[in-house]
Amino acid sequence: MSLSEGQVHRFLDQNPGFADQYFGRKLSPEDVANACEDGCPEGCTSFRELCQVEESAALFELVQDMQENVNMERVVFKILRRLCSILHADRCSLFMYRQRNGVAELATRLFSVQPDSVLEDCLVPPDSEIVFPLDIGVVGHVAQTKKMVNVQDVMECPHFSSFADELTDYVTRNILATPIMNGKDVVAVIMAVNKLDGPCFTSEDEDVFLKYLNFGTLNLKIYHLSYLHNCETRRGQVLLWSANKVFEELTDIERQFHKAFYTVRAYLNCDRYSVGLLDMTKEKEFFDVWPVLMGEAQAYSGPRTPDGREILFYKVIDYILHGKEDIKVIPSPPADHWALASGLPTYVAESGFICNIMNAPADEMFNFQEGPLDDSGWIVKNVLSMPIVNKKEEIVGVATFYNRKDGKPFDEQDEVLMESLTQFLGWSVLNTDTYDKMNKLENRKDIAQDMVLYHVRCDREEIQLILPTRERLGKEPADCEEDELGKILKEVLPGPAKFDIYEFHFSDLECTELELVKCGIQMYYELGVVRKFQIPQEVLVRFLFSVSKGYRRITYHNWRHGFNVAQTMFTLLMTGKLKSYYTDLEAFAMVTAGLCHDIDHRGTNNLYQMKSQNPLAKLHGSSILERHHLEFGKFLLSEETLNIYQNLNRRQHEHVIHLMDIAIIATDLALYFKKRTMFQKIVDESKNYEDRKSWVEYLSLETTRKEIVMAMMMTACDLSAITKPWEVQSKVALLVAAEFWEQGDLERTVLDQQPIPMMDRNKAAELPKLQVGFIDFVCTFVYKEFSRFHEEILPMFDRLQNNRKEWKALADEYEAKVKALEEDQKKETTAKKVGTEICNGGPAPRSSTCRIL
């Protein structure tokens, strides 16, 4: 039976082993040489020897490539291309091992390499990678087991995944794959696909595969170690320069972060990065809580940090490193700022996770912009974001890095480097915190020294002016019984009727400062708190006298003003019937707050403290003077000989201090407009009750509403000079204006700034107009609403209206004079102009009464 040529070809193709043995015996080197153009190497006696010589030459060529070319992809590409020829595989591929977000994966670096392929066609760009998690596909299985795998039929392999086949319209039949190891660590996986001259890869193919890959392994190891060395070098430089800048800048966390991030920008290997700093406030101020409690504002329902803070980026710093370098600092950034709009920084601040996103535009969880962000045409491709955590495990900010410079996604080494930087900076916050605390202590010390130098506590001689125990009893107050002291005070104090302390029209102009101290003591007796709360009477006298001395001798914000505010508070409670809502303890705290509300006032406002860089401005961020008055009042009360709260229990003491906090800070007019609408709603709410008793019962139990009313009472007391009889108000207004003018003089001379009209003594004639504006814009609402709230307070509103008429008349008179003066000046200017024209030969003006015929 004869065989056809085709049958012989098929037999030899299907039996490569037999063909190898047969041609090894039958073919001589001369026969092969005749078939080849290059001839035959000398000394070869068989075909097998000739194959070994060719293989040695190929391996030598690979070694030469490795010596001459440091490019890993190019060397491995040549190895894969030769492997395809030797193994008779359809194609080979290289998968690089990496980790992102703590999850290992394999990504295509060289894909579908064939004997005639070109490197540029097989090199996979970062945005076209095929990525396999280790639990998917044969390559993932190889990376997990770290062993070679020879899959003779992929349909019978449980690990096979057709994912890549579906993407490339290819059919995989068999696979030979092996891991590239560096010690115990996987560096890459190389895979050969589809044996062309047989049904599957053989054991001899496995030997050849491993033999060639020994060289590939060496090259990949060198590449991997070089990359790790580069990463560690960058990491060392980042930490070194960060430490340098951290210890160079200890005063301000923002400047510290900025200097460190800017200095290490060259080592971060990205196009852009953005640092968002978080608000560290854990508890809101009471005036921010009130709108929520009153139902006027929605409670915050957004994301929070792990320690419960609202996520609020108070500043974002953008570092742009591509093209022309630029740094942009955005205070109070809007929600649609490009670095925040995706929601990634907020998510990182909420979860504390490190997020490494390979393909940002395709990410479904975050909303990254797909097109260019700006005119530069820059597009977000891959993102690495991580929290900046301090030593207390609090997230103080979020650092987000965009687009690795080589186009590849950020990997585990990038995560380690960036995390080292953010962790170091987070821990370094301890330095700025410590410095900040030391700075505050230093400021407190300076302020305390100033207080000690200026204020002198009530001494033994001064107390005898009010409590003359030596004259009456021949002994010091400390040696007297409470009944003895009470008897003396009853004789010495003026009584409520003498100076009209129950009246809204009370005036201090006819009183001495000592008489005002006595009236202050009398108010505590009228409230009934001296006996009820066991206030030592010597302590009460010392406290009032010390408070009076605590006020500086300035034009308006002196002891007289402090007493007037307390007296108005007393009158609102007693005469205005507002005490029906408050307990005796609360009334006790409110009058005390009135006495202390402007203690140690400097005669200048909060803005001046900031402009002049006063230590107070460095100590208190907002309501600067009000917080200082509060601290000074507490300072006096902390002294045992002045502590009128000394016999209160712990709960009572906490309550009165809390009320003083609210009452004194509420005198900041900057907060007045925040509480107006809330107070108005309470007044409107009171009109829904038919009888006052039920309303009083309701409001007495509503803590938040009572605090809002109390805060507005403090404003009404602080502005009460505007409601005094005209003969009193006109004089007090001049005192207020004089103090403002003094501040204006300081601004002009010390700060070299032009003061506003209200504080410019050169515009003193405009005082009536300014008073009318102040009454309309600030005062009218307060007293109108209080007169609606309690009709007993109507006299204050009536006198306010009367005073407005008086000021308006003066303002109109001034305006008329100014207008007349302007008209006279205009006529004079016109006359001069006409005279000049006549002198220059021009026509004389016509007379309206005479005519020349």
UniProtKB/Swiss-Prot annotation:
<dbReference type="GO" id="GO:0047555">
    <property type="term" value="F:3',5'-cyclic-GMP phosphodiesterase activity"/>
</dbReference>
<dbReference type="InterPro" id="IPR002073">
    <property type="entry name" value="PDEase_catalytic_dom"/>
</dbReference>
<dbReference type="GO" id="GO:0060041">
    <property type="term" value="P:retina development in camera-type eye"/>
</dbReference>
<feature type="active site" description="Proton donor">
    <location>
        <position position="557"/>
    </location>
</feature>
<dbReference type="GO" id="GO:0004115">
    <property type="term" value="F:3',5'-cyclic-AMP phosphodiesterase activity"/>
</dbReference>
<dbReference type="GO" id="GO:0043153">
    <property type="term" value="P:entrainment of circadian clock by photoperiod"/>
</dbReference>
<dbReference type="GO" id="GO:0097381">
    <property type="term" value="C:photoreceptor disc membrane"/>
</dbReference>
<feature type="lipid moiety-binding region" description="S-geranylgeranyl cysteine">
    <location>
        <position position="850"/>
    </location>
</feature>
<comment type="subunit">
    <text>Oligomer composed of two catalytic chains (alpha and beta), an inhibitory chain (gamma) and the delta chain.</text>
</comment>
<feature type="binding site">
    <location>
        <position position="597"/>
    </location>
    <ligand>
        <name>a divalent metal cation 1</name>
    </ligand>
</feature>
<keyword id="KW-0140">cGMP</keyword>
<feature type="modified residue" description="N-acetylserine">
    <location>
        <position position="2"/>
    </location>
</feature>
<dbReference type="InterPro" id="IPR029016">
    <property type="entry name" value="GAF-like_dom_sf"/>
</dbReference>
<feature type="binding site">
    <location>
        <position position="718"/>
    </location>
    <ligand>
        <name>a divalent metal cation 1</name>
    </ligand>
</feature>
<keyword id="KW-0472">Membrane</keyword>
<keyword id="KW-0636">Prenylation</keyword>
<feature type="propeptide" description="Removed in mature form">
    <location>
        <begin position="851"/>
        <end position="853"/>
    </location>
</feature>
<keyword id="KW-0007">Acetylation</keyword>
<feature type="domain" description="GAF 2">
    <location>
        <begin position="252"/>
        <end position="429"/>
    </location>
</feature>
<feature type="domain" description="GAF 1">
    <location>
        <begin position="71"/>
        <end position="220"/>
    </location>
</feature>
<keyword id="KW-0378">Hydrolase</keyword>
<protein>
    <recommendedName>
        <fullName>Rod cGMP-specific 3',5'-cyclic phosphodiesterase subunit beta</fullName>
        <ecNumber>3.1.4.35</ecNumber>
    </recommendedName>
</protein>
<comment type="function">
    <text>Necessary for the formation of a functional phosphodiesterase holoenzyme. Involved in retinal circadian rhythm photoentrainment via modulation of UVA and orange light-induced phase-shift of the retina clock. May participate in processes of transmission and amplification of the visual signal.</text>
</comment>
<dbReference type="InterPro" id="IPR003607">
    <property type="entry name" value="HD/PDEase_dom"/>
</dbReference>
<feature type="binding site">
    <location>
        <position position="598"/>
    </location>
    <ligand>
        <name>a divalent metal cation 2</name>
    </ligand>
</feature>
<dbReference type="GO" id="GO:0046872">
    <property type="term" value="F:metal ion binding"/>
</dbReference>
<dbReference type="Pfam" id="PF01590">
    <property type="entry name" value="GAF"/>
</dbReference>
<keyword id="KW-0966">Cell projection</keyword>
<feature type="binding site">
    <location>
        <position position="598"/>
    </location>
    <ligand>
        <name>a divalent metal cation 1</name>
    </ligand>
</feature>
<dbReference type="GO" id="GO:0019933">
    <property type="term" value="P:cAMP-mediated signaling"/>
</dbReference>
<keyword id="KW-0479">Metal-binding</keyword>
<dbReference type="GO" id="GO:0042622">
    <property type="term" value="C:photoreceptor outer segment membrane"/>
</dbReference>
<feature type="binding site">
    <location>
        <position position="561"/>
    </location>
    <ligand>
        <name>a divalent metal cation 1</name>
    </ligand>
</feature>
<dbReference type="Pfam" id="PF00233">
    <property type="entry name" value="PDEase_I"/>
</dbReference>
<keyword id="KW-0677">Repeat</keyword>
<comment type="function">
    <text>Rod-specific cGMP phosphodiesterase that catalyzes the hydrolysis of 3',5'-cyclic GMP. Necessary for the formation of a functional phosphodiesterase holoenzyme. Involved in retinal circadian rhythm photoentrainment via modulation of UVA and orange light-induced phase-shift of the retina clock. May participate in processes of transmission and amplification of the visual signal.</text>
</comment>
<dbReference type="GO" id="GO:0007601">
    <property type="term" value="P:visual perception"/>
</dbReference>
<dbReference type="InterPro" id="IPR023088">
    <property type="entry name" value="PDEase"/>
</dbReference>
<keyword id="KW-0716">Sensory transduction</keyword>
<dbReference type="InterPro" id="IPR036971">
    <property type="entry name" value="PDEase_catalytic_dom_sf"/>
</dbReference>
<dbReference type="InterPro" id="IPR003018">
    <property type="entry name" value="GAF"/>
</dbReference>
<keyword id="KW-0844">Vision</keyword>
